């Protein structure tokens, strides 16, 4: 019913003049959403489900789009999914199921459609490049030998040389991308390094004393031997996952309305940690329609904490509740019932947030994070079974992460509507 209320004109226009009768976008979209909401993600499994499952036959209007049609539709219209998410939230608001206020933010590592064993490190690429060049030189010398040494049966020198030269070209391309990433990283680290130097110098001038502590370490230019690129999905990154070990992943971010548990915005990034993800999410939240209400507070764990993030929330007129340190396992039993001293006049945004987190209301709101955004991520991964992206590339996985969020929201709306 919700899909029938969505404005799909942009999708419909894309099919005009195709020459052959096509499945209606609403049918294909419904099939995909129902699949992601019930743990059926692959296009071949979706096609088979339209034959085997009564529920899928109903959703697909007893039609049977093949896997190629479903997969092409999914890839083609990924950019439109985020707009459809907003439409669904507006429908939920009209049904009085959501009104923005307090939002919780969290991130989770989602496996990429690539094996970590397909990764090539910069150090290994140098060794492999040297080895292949030596092999090519030996093969060329063998080809030019005047005594026409006998070759092993089935061995073709041109083919062997061409195969190694192809690998050398692929390695050179991979090295160039690693070097480009290293240059970008160096520029960012150099800017941070210079800012720290300027801060030390300014403080020294203010106090008239030499700077205390060790000076910041200057960044190193160029790639490190351990810098790597994945040859299957070069935009994915090696990340540490819960339970131990490392996998080829993306970092999927979700912002959840704390009352309805509906996902209001998502983001997918290549960074392992969450510290740089507050400001991008604030920009996304700012694009939500006024009809949904205004985000009043943003709740996040200590992985998101930095002074810059707290100040960014203040500039957006959003109250931050970001843990500044991990919670103690055995806190003082009186702490929960003791109000903090009054906040001093002229307190900074960070000091105001620290004070807020010690108040009864602040503690209660922050505690809700554990029963809002964390369960949503848990359900997406453990109940819906979405633990790995099917698509490759940052732009594509962002669209697929939106599709997951859209499926979750429709599933959640069904529960909220009773």
Regions found by a protein language model. Name each.
Residues 1-33, 38:
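Basic, short loop/linker segments at the boundary and entry of helix-turn-helix/winged-helix-like folds
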